[in-house]
């Protein structure tokens, strides 16, 4: 599901809100989540999961075009860990 599809689905379910209000709310939520992770903080949504940053160590990679070895710097990457309720719901739906 894309952000646009999420907004469309919410518009269909929340008929008392305008499409612009829903779009703004979704964008605000995502912006707040991104800025929280950017500042190094963790996000926990009970029953859904948590977002945090994991550090990837520097390593030697390979340029796929040339095959040359390339030094890759260490970096932080976003990580999502699903909560127990979400895992159970997904597994029961399959």
Swiss-Prot record:
HAMAP family: IHF_beta. It comes from the Bacteria. Keywords: DNA recombination, DNA-binding, Transcription, Transcription regulation, Translation regulation. GO terms for molecular function: DNA binding; structural constituent of chromatin. Heterodimer of an alpha and a beta chain. The lineage of its organism: Bacteria, Pseudomonadati, Pseudomonadota, Gammaproteobacteria, Vibrionales. GO terms for cellular component: chromosome; cytosol. InterPro entries: Hist_DNA-bd (IPR000119), Histone-like_DNA-bd_CS (IPR020816), IHF-like_DNA-bd_dom_sf (IPR010992), IHF_beta (IPR005685). This is Integration host factor subunit beta. It comes from Vibrio atlanticus (strain LGP32) (Vibrio splendidus (strain Mel32)). Gene3D superfamilies: IHF-like DNA-binding proteins. Transmembrane segments: none annotated. Belongs to the bacterial histone-like protein family. This protein is one of the two subunits of integration host factor, a specific DNA-binding protein that functions in genetic recombination as well as in transcriptional and translational control. GO terms for biological process: DNA recombination; regulation of DNA-templated transcription; regulation of translation.
């Amino acid at each position: 599901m894309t952000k646009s599809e999420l907004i469309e689905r919410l518009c269909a379910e929340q008929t008392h809100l305008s499409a612009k209000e829903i779009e703004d709310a979704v964008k605000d939520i995502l912006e707040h989540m991104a800025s929280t992770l950017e500042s190094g903080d963790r996000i926990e949504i009970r029953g859904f999961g948590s977002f945090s940053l994991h550090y990837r160590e520097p390593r030697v990679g390979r340029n796929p075009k040339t095959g040359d070895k390339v030094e890759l710097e260490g970096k932080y990457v976003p990580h999502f860990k699903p909560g127990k309720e979400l895992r159970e719901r997904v597994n029961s739906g399959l």
